[in-house]
Amino acid sequence: MTTSTPALAVTQANGSFETISLERRDLRDDDILIDIKFAGICHSDIHTVRQEWGDITFPITPGHEIAGIVAAVGDGVTKYKVGDRVGVGCMVDSCGECENCKNDHEQFCTKPAVFTYNSLNYDGERAQGGYSQQIVVTERFACRIPDSL
């Protein structure tokens, strides 16, 4: 089942943020659902919502500096369990099958890679970022945050 989550989105270039509801995809075998606790603001978020780096599809929920707690895991997830603290950067998926992906160079994925926002997921839906309460990412695009931090 898809997950509905509140999010902040911009609906037009140079517009203000508005609260919307996002539908996050169903968990695939290698996905994790993250309850977002923190999302940083990067200048790239500002450039994007102002359309200074090219056209975007509105509404858009930016945010690619994400920290949170794993809330659910897909059946094939091996790196994380519910309750783990994780971070997410600017990518959330790649094909995982091309030579670049197999050699840990997902940013050069031949399919191409899926960025955290303003990118198409492989299911054809537009990726939306971390200015929301939850996000679904492929487990290999999360990184563990040590309890000591």
Task: Please report, for each region that a protein language model flagged, where it lies by residue.
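A near-ubiquitous, low-amplitude feature marking generic local secondary-structure context
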Residues: 5, 19, 53, 81-84, ...
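Glycine-rich beta-strand-centered segment in the early N-terminal region that forms part
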Residues: 25-39, 52-102, 107, 128, ...
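NAD(P)H dinucleotide-binding glycine-rich loop of Rossmann-like/cofactor-binding domains
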Residues: 95-149
